[in-house]
């Protein structure tokens, strides 16, 4: 019995040594968007923000307000896709835009019925992208309706993409961690996500590892067109990572990091 315990202990030690030394430095937390200096250019790219929303009336007043009040001085428009909500999500959204005097920056898109072969969120997002494409933006920001964005988040994302010639920039936002179970499970989730997708490898063009965090993805319009649009991941189980893999597989450059100032409002 003692020999078995010793063997298992040594095996665990070898595995952890391998992970620590050769598995993409997954424990590192230095891939943070806020650590990048914000550079202001005279001419900034245009951005269309696409927000799929279904029965999000309780969080829209916070999340949409944070988007409308971004300090990004370039041209940006928000397309909120109302995915057949029954709680007045669209009305709340219009009220928020009116309250902050930003009605010119918000367009409401009413989602059509879900076709065969699509997941609900991706279908809503695809409709938003299609409508936003009429403006031929340089970038799309794909973000969830339950994300409260730091006032400079869009500026940081665009600066990161432009300064490093990236096709896709994504951040894992700071997840809500208040209840007992959230405090127990959320840190473990982030830890194991980084173990599965070491950010050092994701951000290395020479590595095939690809990942993104679906709550906040900035993608260049041309890169999205090159891979065939969102329809190529319409049935993907992990759509955010599938999108990142499609971009990287088509010789695109991607970056994934953490954010400490942009947060998720959703309880877990």
What are the residue ranges of the model-derived segments?
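Short, well-formed alpha-helical segments that are part of the catalytic scaffolds
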Residues: 28-35, 56-69
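Active-site nucleotide-sugar/metal-binding loop of Leloir-type enzymes
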Residues: 123-139
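Catalytic donor/gating beta->alpha subdomain of glycosyltransferases that bind UDP-sugars
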Residues: 161, 168-194, 222-268
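Short beta-strand-to-loop acidic/aromatic patch adjacent to the donor-nucleotide binding site
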Residues: 136-148
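Cell-envelope/extracellular polymer assembly enzymes that use nucleotide-activated donors
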Residues: 45-48, 77
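Acceptor/aglycone-binding surface of glycosyltransferases and processive sugar-polymer synthases
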Residues: 113-127, 158-159, 163-218, 222-223
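Acidic donor-binding segment of Leloir-type glycosyltransferases
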Residues: 64-114
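N-terminal membrane-anchoring/stem segments of glycan-assembly enzymes
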Residues: 1-41, 186-187, 199
């Amino acid at each position: 019995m003692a020999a078995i315990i010793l063997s298992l202990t040594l095996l665990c030690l070898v595995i952890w040594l391998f992970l620590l030394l050769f598995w993409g430095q997954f424990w590192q937390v230095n891939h943070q968007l806020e650590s990048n200096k914000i550079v202001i250019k005279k001419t900034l790219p245009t951005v269309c923000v696409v927000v799929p929303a279904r029965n999000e009336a309780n969080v829209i007043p916070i999340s949409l307000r944070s988007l409308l009040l971004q300090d990004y001085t370039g041209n940006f428009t928000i397309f909120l896709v109302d995915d057949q909500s029954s709680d007045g999500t669209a009305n709340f959204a219009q009220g928020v835009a009116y309250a902050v005097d930003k009605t010119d920056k918000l367009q409401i898109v009413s989602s059509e019925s879900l076709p065969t072969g699509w997941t609900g969120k991706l279908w809503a997002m695809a409709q938003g992208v299609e409508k936003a494409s009429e403006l031929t933006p340089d970038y799309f920001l794909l973000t969830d309706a339950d994300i409260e964005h730091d006032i400079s988040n869009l500026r940081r994302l665009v600066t990161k993409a432009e300064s490093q010639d990236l096709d896709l920039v994504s951040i894992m936002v700071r997840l809500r961690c208040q209840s007992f179970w959230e405090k127990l499970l959320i840190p473990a989730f982030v830890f194991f996500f980084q173990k599965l997708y070491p950010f050092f490898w994701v951000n290395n063009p020479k590595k095939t590892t690809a990942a993104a965090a679906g709550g906040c993805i900035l993608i260049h319009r041309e890169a999205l067109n090159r891979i065939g649009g969102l329809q190529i991941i319409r049935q993907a189980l992990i759509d955010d990572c599938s999108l990142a893999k499609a971009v990287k597989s088509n010789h695109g450059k991607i970056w994934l990091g953490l954010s400490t100032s942009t947060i998720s409002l959703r309880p877990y």
